[in-house]
Swiss-Prot record:
Family to which this protein belongs: Belongs to the CinA family.
HAMAP family with a match to the protein in the record: CinA_B
CDD domains recorded: cinA
Pfam families: CinA, CinA_KH, MoCF_biosynth
Name this polypeptide is given: Putative competence-damage inducible protein
InterPro entries: CinA (IPR050101), CinA-like_C (IPR036653), CinA_C (IPR008136), CinA_KH (IPR041424), Competence-induced_CinA (IPR008135), MoaB/Mog-like_dom_sf (IPR036425), MoaB/Mog_dom (IPR001453)
Organism: Pediococcus pentosaceus (strain ATCC 25745 / CCUG 21536 / LMG 10740 / 183-1w)
Disulfide bonds: none
Gene3D superfamilies: 3.30.70.2860, CinA-like, MoaB/Mog-like domain
Length: 413
């Protein structure tokens, strides 16, 4: 069957955001054997949306619209589709109750514009949104079927995975069950991991294997098709074993929505390993990330932001002579910062950060030159030097993420 994607949003046309949703859906449809015939991007304009629907309906079996389901006046995708197919919109009771409960919980008044998010086309099936308020739509006609989905990726992707896939399987009798497995790796570079698993990737058609790279970790997503869920799981587990035989030493977690930092903090909580930090260039960003994880208070009593040299000495005992002899961006200072923080708060481990975020150099140290230290209660200390590339924000972020990576490598792994 042929499908067409219509992305709705003036912000996409203006280049203010990247349309990752269309890419996500196209890749998924390809795995299902659904051919994406075309993609159209239109602004928040009723005539343009209806024109796109008319063109798409003439040449495609399935038309998917993405975006334009919010509460504002320019969110008009449902209204445009209703006018195009000649149907009325009415509030879906369950969706409207979800919106009502949400605003009541937030102690905010429910306005008419927010009720718009619960509108459903007469004769259509609702596609429920587990992560938002905008109700999706599936509408069947003799010539063309329509799926209407919200634009925020945090809502769109779960709806596609959890709601649209089963709906498509049921509606079109897709002959196979589709199951996915997501594996997460850290401590290995993009090129190295790709080279190690290249033979497996090249020789596999079921499951399909997709690699996604981020600055600090790598995700491998496996998607299998089979006649049953059990058979699909067997295929996935077989390929997972093949991959782990090659890169298992870098594997840290499995699951669709895994945050590396959450994983590390939760492992510390599980093992009752207390943590503190002494931060210079990162300015508290590491500690802020730690406390984003629920339950972090059980292992994180607090930390230190020691931006100035004198504060490093005053709060965590870094010797002025150490800074003078080695400069503040050095292994020796990272060691004393980590050791001082660990002893001061009597934690099991402590992480330290000292370096140059930029944009200028500091005492011959170039932007991106960072030392991270990790001190343990037993007196051992690990330090590592990094030379990150990027702007000030990126350098600070990479430093924070590699602090978590050092904990994983030296404490958890």
């Amino acid at each position: 069957m042929n499908a067409e994607i219509i992305s709705v949003g003036t912000e996409i046309l203006l280049g203010e955001i990247v349309d990752t949703n269309a890419v996500y859906l196209s890749q998924l449809f390809a795995k299902l054997g659904i051919d994406v015939f075309n993609k159209i991007t239109v602004g928040d304009n009723e005539k343009n949306i209806m024109d796109a629907l008319e063109v798409a309906s003439k040449r495609s079996d399935l038309v998917v619209t993405i975006g334009g389901l919010g509460p504002t006046e320019d969110d008009i995708t449902k209204q445009s589709l209703a006018k195009f197919v000649g149907k009325n919109l009415k509030h879906h009771p369950e969706a409207l109750q979800q919106i009502t409960d949400y605003f009541k919980k937030q102690n905010r008044p429910l306005t008419k514009n927010n009720e718009r998010q619960a509108l459903l086309l007469d004769g259509a099936k609702p596609i429920h949104n587990p992560n938002g308020l905008a109700l999706g739509i599936f509408y069947h006609t003799e010539q063309t079927d329509y799926i209407v989905l919200p634009g925020p990726p945090s809502e769109f992707e779960p709806m596609v995975d959890e709601k649209v896939l089963p709906l498509l399987s049921q509606q079109y009798g897709l002959e196979k069950t589709i199951q996915s497995k997501t594996l997460h790796f850290v401590g290995i570079g993009e090129a190295d991991l790709a080279a190690r698993v290249d033979e497996i990737v090249r020789n596999q058609s079921n499951p399909t294997i997709a690699l996604y790279f981020k600055p600090t970790d790598v995700t491998i997503r496996l998607t299998a098709k089979a006649n049953s869920k059990l058979a699909a799981e067997e295929i996935l587990n077989h390929t997972k074993k093949q991959l782990l035989d090659r890169v298992g030493e870098f594997f840290y977690a499995e699951g669709d929505r895994v945050s590396f930092t959450d994983f590390v903090v939760n492992q510390l909580i599980k093992r009752n390993i207390s943590l503190t930090a002494a931060e210079s260039l990162t300015g508290g960003a590491f500690e802020s990330t730690v406390v984003e994880t629920s339950g972090a208070a059980t292992i994180f009593p607090g930390g230190f932001v020691t931006y100035a040299d004198e504060v490093k000495s005053k709060l965590i005992g870094v010797q002025p002579a150490t800074i003078e002899e080695n400069t503040v961006v050095s292994r020796q200072v990272a060691e004393e910062m980590a050791r001082g923080a660990q002893k001061t708060l009597d934690t099991d481990i402590a992480v330290s950060f000292t370096g140059v975020a930029g944009p200028g150099a500091l005492e011959h140290h170039q932007p991106g030159n960072v030392w991270i230290g990790l001190a343990k209660r037993d007196g051992s200390i690990v330090t590592k030097e990094f030379n990150f590339v990027g702007n000030r924000e990126k350098i600070r972020h990479l430093a924070v993420m590699n602090g978590f990576r050092m904990i994983w490598e030296n404490v958890i792994k």
